[in-house]
Design a protein with these regions (language model features):
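Secretory targeting and sorting signals
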Residues: 16, 22-23, 29-62
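N-terminal low-complexity Pro/Gly-rich stretches
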Residues: 1-23
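Generic alpha-helical structural signal
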Residues: 2-5, 26, 40, 478
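Extracytoplasmic/lumenal domain signature
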Residues: 59, 63-542
Length: 542
């Protein structure tokens, strides 16, 4: 749809004028809700009894594998290190991934829950920082939930405390708030930006904000997509940048990646979107927007036959030395078209397809790909999750009771592929060394819990397996873990894996945030240590 006028600097729309040629998206919203109920009903059959909640449960290195206070449970035969601490919250945690950043001598963790609470925690102790948690500032009588991952960014420069930015939106609960909110580290509100609404579809922002430099100056800009059909870019004060918002005429689920193409002034915005006739496309769009001579320009765009709900990753993946944009697809258009079973890669500079791509997947790839070295070749690979489907409809992806994680080299050759327990995986992989070598291994979740996988061989590590056991099977994952060298004093100090999990509210489990010691002190930095690579969530390989 289109609008009669752009919003003001507070993000308020004067009024809405729908186009007769544009269909509404009531069917899309209804189908999403039905799908999630079906997924939950399949997974509930495998659920164990719910554990009690607690504020913080620090665990000694030799503690028993189960902590009754917060439900930390190791699967059968698991040799993964015992948890350093575990914190349970009253709201469930679904697709919001933990984000980790350092400020001073403290490492902080930020994650959102389905009650609209944003948690900011000391990663060494597991305790909320002073002034936290904070509920998003939804108007009275509205329901607010968070599935966007919080972004931690130094909007006032590297010598001032960071800010935390997150969107309100949910596919699991009926969210009625439509905003992106920025907080100061103290918990004080920095700004609230209200997005619009589109007739017949859900409201809100599930897209994770990315922070970068769009215009080439020193300012840090905030970029995100919205279900109101628009792509936004804001200043640190929450005001729109020139040329924004950009009308996509359909919903945006994807989180943007920001990357400065060599020879350009500022970062390009690479983002996926839905398409149902916009630019003569029925399926999904992957686009590159950038400022050219001071004006915002659509530099290149590809139309694929399926929605693009995946969040793109950017990085060099072959000997060309050119950065590639790698992205998966969704599952709206049914019977599934060809693109549903593909992972795409385009060169960032001009949008040309990378030789050997797209590659074949076992179903939709909802998560964000990870890029990094996972073997001794010295060349980065691509790792992503996908559903396992045996037909051309979303229900055919439920009855397989499985998902898959796969690694490809930059030429599109499959290196290895592993099946994971539980269907319709929404988790994104993280790449970090779990051994003493110079390459990265894979940490990835599913509805069954967290898996550790050898990056070079694809074999399961620490006793995890798709048929028997995961790291804490009560910690259902619909997001990504974070890996960091945690500063400060406390049981979680040092190299750690931080997991936020439990699953949607349909499971009746509290949200759980757990810190585990990394099995080894890595001799190389993790290549892709959290969702969309870094605290600013620019989605670009280091």
């Amino acid at each position: 749809m289109t609008r009669s006028a752009p919003p003001n600097e507070r993000g308020e729309w004067p009024h809405v004028v729908p186009l007769a040629a544009r269909r509404t998206h009531a069917l899309r919203h209804r189908r999403i809700k039905i799908t999630r109920v079906l997924v939950a009903s399949v997974l509930v059959a495998f659920a164990t009894a719910a554990g009690a909640t607690a504020t913080v449960a620090p665990l000694a290195a030799a503690a028993a594998p189960h902590d009754a206070a917060c439900g930390v449970l190791q699967g059968h035969g698991i040799t993964w290190p015992s948890a350093s601490w575990a914190t349970c919250v009253t709201g469930s945690i679904a697709e919001s991934s933990p984000t980790v950043a350092d400020w001073g001598d403290t490492t902080i963790v930020a994650v959102g829950d389905e009650n609209g609470m944003l948690h900011v925690i000391n990663a060494a102790t597991g305790r909320e920082l002073p002034g936290w948690p904070q509920r998003l500032a939804a108007p009275a009588g509205t329901r607010v939930a968070i599935e966007s991952s919080p972004t931690i960014a130094f909007l006032d420069g590297p010598n001032k405390p960071p800010s935390i930015i997150v969107g309100a939106g949910s596919t699991w609960v009926h969210n009625t708030a439509r905003e992106v909110e920025a907080f100061r580290l103290s918990g004080a509100i920095r700004f609230v930006f209200h997005v619009g609404s589109a007739p017949g579809t859900a409201v809100g922002v599930i897209s994770t904000p990315a922070v970068g430099n769009l215009t080439g100056g020193s300012q840090q800009d905030i970029v995100f997509g919205s279900w109101d059909h628009y792509l936004y870019a804001l200043t640190p004060a929450g005001r729109l940048l020139p040329g924004f918002p950009v009308n996509n005429a359909d919903t945006i689920w994807s989180s943007p990646a920001l990357y400065r193409v060599p020879g350009t002034v500022g970062d390009s915005i690479f983002i996926g979107a839905d398409a149902s006739s916009w630019h003569n496309c029925r399926g999904g769009l992957i686009s590159d927007y950038r400022y050219v001579r001071g004006a915002l320009k659509l530099v290149w765009q590809h139309c694929e036959s399926q929605t693009i709900w995946s969040s793109p990753a950017v990085g060099v993946i072959n000997s060309s030395g050119r950065a590639a944009v790698v992205v998966g697809t969704g599952y709206f258009w049914q019977p599934f078209p060809w693109a549903t079973y593909r992972l795409f890669a385009y060169y960032a500079d001009d949008g040309a397809r990378v030789p050997g791509w797209p590659v074949v997947t076992s179903g939709p790839s909802f998560g964000s790909p990870a890029i990094g070295m996972i073997n001794k070749t010295g060349v980065p690979a691509v790792v992503d999750t996908s559903w396992v489907c045996d037909g051309l409809t979303e229900t055919s992806c439920l009855t397989t009771y499985a998902s898959r994680v796969t690694a490809w080299n930059g030429n599109g050759r499959r290196l290895w592929s592993d099946e994971l327990s539980q269907p319709t995986d929404f988790s994104s992989p993280v790449l970090a060394p779990l051994h003493t070598g110079t390459w990265n291994d894979v940490l990835v979740g599913s509805g069954a819990g967290l898996y550790a996988i050898n990056g070079r061989t694809g074999t399961f590590m620490f006793g995890s397996s798709p048929t028997d056991s995961t790291i804490d099977p009560t910690c259902r994952m619909f997001n990504a873990v974070a890996v960091a060298d945690v500063l400060g004093e406390g049981p979680g100090a040092g190299w750690s894996v931080i997991e936020a999990c439990g699953g949607p509210a349909q499971f009746s489990y509290p949200g759980k945030i757990v810190s585990y010691p990394l099995p080894v002190v890595p001799i190389v930095q993790p290549a892709w240590p959290m969702f969309h690579q870094d605290p600013a969530h620019d989605g670009t390989a280091a």
